[in-house]
From Swiss-Prot:
Keywords: Ribonucleoprotein, Ribosomal protein, RNA-binding, rRNA-binding. GO terms for molecular function: rRNA binding; structural constituent of ribosome. It comes from Prochlorococcus marinus (strain MIT 9515). InterPro entries: bL21-like, bL21-like_sf, Ribosomal_bL21, Ribosomal_bL21_CS. One of its GO terms (biological process) is translation. The gene is rplU. Residues 95-146 are annotated as: Disordered. This is Large ribosomal subunit protein bL21. Residues 115-146 have a biased composition (Low complexity).
């Protein structure tokens, strides 16, 4: 008996656009119209959030890799809800002593939905270093010395 199920069930074949981004000190694989639970953000429900620290973007024909981040790339997220993760129990015990300590922790999370992944192909008009040197030389020439 052979299985007719296609391999690579992890990657979505209908949507070839994805990005790997860094937020909350972790890296996430983001795809459009999917929900993700990340560490608690200071935002209200239905707020829009933009992530600029994008490490990789792949669309249908090409892959962009940042060094370390991709310039002019962004991911737009919408806050869906705030929630708490399941409780983690931490139990510490010292053998042969009557010392035991049981603690619990629940991580605060924010559920977000990815609205769009985009990269803009903009070229700089002029480098900021040359503009800064022009301004500094012109301001020195216009001031009279005492």
């Amino acid at each position: 008996m052979t299985s007719s199920k296609k391999s690579s069930d992890n990657s979505s074949s209908s949507n070839d656009l994805y990005a790997i981004a860094e937020t909350s000190g972790q890296q996430f694989w983001f795809e459009v119209d999917r929900y993700y639970d990340i560490d608690r953000l200071n935002a209200k429900e239905k707020d829009k959030i933009t992530i600029d620290k994008i490490l990789l973007i792949k669309d249908k024909e090409n892959v962009s890799i940042g060094k370390p981040y991709i310039k002019n790339a962004k991911i737009e997220l919408e806050v869906v809800s705030h929630k708490r993760d399941k409780k983690i129990i931490v139990y510490k015990m010292r053998p042969k002593k009557k010392t035991r300590r049981k603690m619990g922790h629940r991580q605060e999370l924010t559920r977000v939905m990815v609205k769009s992944i985009s990269i803009s192909k903009s070229t700089p008009k002029s480098s900021p270093k040359t503009e800064a040197t022009k301004k500094s030389t012109s301001s020195k020439a216009s001031k009279p010395e005492n």
